[in-house]
UniProtKB/Swiss-Prot annotation:
Family under the similarity heading: Belongs to the prefoldin subunit beta family.
Chain segments annotated as coiled-coil in the UniProt record: 22-98, 165-497, 527-622
Pfam families: DUF4686
Tissue expression as described in the entry: Expressed in brain, kidney, pancreas, placenta, liver, thymus and prostate.
PANTHER family (UniProt xref): COILED-COIL DOMAIN-CONTAINING PROTEIN 30
Compositional bias per record (Basic and acidic residues), positions renumbered to this chain: 1-22, 131-191
Biased composition range(s): Polar residues: 106-115
Descriptive protein name: Coiled-coil domain-containing protein 30
Top-level lineage group: Eukaryota
Stretch list, region Disordered: 1-26, 101-191, 209-231, 731-755
Alphabetized UniProt keyword annotations: Coiled coil
Gene: CCDC30
Amino acid sequence: MSQEKNEMFESEWSKEREREKQLASGLDTAEKALKVESEELQKSKSELICLYNEVHNLPGESESKDHFLIACDLLQRENSELETKVLKLSQEFAQLNHFTLGGKTAPSNLITSENTCKDPESNEPILETEIQSRKEETEELCPKLGERKQKEIPEESVKEGSFPREGQKEEGSQQNRDMKDEEKEQQLTMKPEEIVRLREELSHINQSLLQSQSSGDSSDDSGAQHPSSGEKLKYNQQGEVQQLHQNLHRLQILCNSAENELRYERGQNLDLKQHNSLLQEENIKIKIELKHAQQKLLDSTKMCSSLTAEYKHCQQKIKELELEVLKHTQSIKSQNNLQEKLVQEKSKVADAEEKILDLQRKLEHAHKVCLTDTCISEKQQLEEKIKEATQNEAKVKQQYQEEQQKRKLLYQNVDELHRQVRTLQDKENLLEMTCSQQQSRIQQQEALLKQLENEKRKYDEHVKSNQELSEKLSKLQQEKEALREEYLRLLKLLNVHVRNYNEKHHQQKVKLQKVKYRLTNEVELRDKRINQFEDEIGILQHKIEKEKAIQDQITAQNDTLLLEKRKLQEQVIEQEQLIHSNKWTISSIQSRVLYMDKENKQLQENSLRLTQQIGFLERIIRSIHIRRGENLKEFPVPKWWHRGKLASLPPTKKQKEIYSTEVFTSNNAELQHEDESVPEATEKWKHSEQMETTISDILESEVVNEILPLSNSSFSGKGLVESFASLQETEEIKSKEAMASSKSPEKSPENLVCSQNSEAGYINVASLKETHGIQEQDQKSEL
């Protein structure tokens, strides 16, 4: 049972090791995935930084706006100058009206009117050039304003997202622009009134011309008498009037074109107003966002400081955890070594048990073969080995239990460490996200600061340039013709730039879409990975619960094992007590065996002596038989002698008595029949019987002398007792025969002596055989 339980524990240990390896591999894969995600994030960050740099380069293109604004200011001033010139022309037309009304007056007035008419003729090419230049400038400004609007829209979106501080420093410039727009509106409201005045004046001029023509016709009728001087004046006046009509027609065309331009400028002003209102709203939003961003910056700085401290603390914890993991691995290795030692000791114990069984068998065999000394020494050694093995088993079991407790604690520490690692990884991810966001915000804010500083510098430069431009206005009027040629080039360049800008804008949109697509894909991948990690966490939790259940089972099994161990210890104690008792019995048996060995040796010596004596007796008996044969040749032997042989005598007492009586009766009967046939041989028989009695007495004395020292030895005593009993029986038989002989006087004393001698010899030989058989039986029983 203990071996099976140990195997179960070892299998559970192997399973737990495999689970630990799987967890370690899962952690490695998670760390690799985190590294890959961090690399992808760095790549996306680098791409975003490139895009931000491209967006930062866009304000460089917006610097051309300032040049267009300067050109607009110049055009506004030129418009004001043209308006002053138009006022002058209106005054001149008023003078012409007065001249036409007073056409009948002196020729001096005509001369003045000619001068005045000549003045507008001289002013016409100037006005035409100015109007054409104005048209060209407005045509130049229209695409520039369109480009400016197109540029302002993405710039505003960029400013709202990444440059929220521009509104604070552009407030002054926007206020100046608002003032300029109001002045333009006032000028535009003034321009239509002036145009109406010009039209009225032109209508008056037309009426005056018609009146002058009618007056000229009447003067032709009246002045027919003076054809020479009057006709010249008329022709001159008619030519002047035609020229004035042409000039008026040209002026009307110019006025219509000016009205169209004014309408176009009004529409542009309305668009600019709407754009300014939108910009103001956006500025307000940007201010609010700036405040929020500043607060977030402060919070983020605080968070950065706290997170850096936490990050350092987490790194220290990670190092400590790594050290604990190393210690845990070392403890696991030591546990493995101890388990191997346990297995080796168990194998040694099994071998020792097998040896014990073999030795027990040998002990039994040694008891049979009487080799107890060597068995006792080996048994003592084996007992010592068993004690050492039991002690080693107890120590190893204690170490195993301690290591199991340590392992449980280590597993708990590992679980806590895994949880701490997960929390630290989450915190690291949050820290990286917050740091990246804060770095991007800081970069954006630094870029905004740089841009605002550049704008301040530009604004100061613009102020200085405005002062210089006021001085250079006179020079610019001369350079207008050169600028016209350059304007065509600029238009072409603008078209090219617009196309390039649109292409870049489209490319940027495509890049942004790609970045968005990548970001969405990365977010989806992260979500999938997060779900996978959550599933793995659930599986691990389920496994941990299973491990806890297994640990509970193991504890229950340990309790049962402890109970079984106690029972086994009690059994071992009982067995030791039995072993002690067996030792005492074995020692007593050994002492007896030694004693019996000594007795056996003595008995063997006695048996050798007896065999020698038996051989000696057989020789004597042969010699007696030989002598008897010689005597029988001389004297025949009776039948009763053949019946009274030693081999045919019964061994027991009763049978001996019965046999003796039967022999006695048969001998008496035979003697009665044979007494008549052998009366003469009595004397010879007496002599032979005396010889036999002497020999038998000698033999009896020798046998008794040899048996008496045997009685003093430590023999079992059965043979001696039986020998004495047989002697007593022989004495009783002799006494009975004596009684019978006394009763039957017919029997001769010779027959009695022969029977007594034969019986004594028979008893001696039977006693010797019985002692020899008893010794063999004792040896067999001992074996």
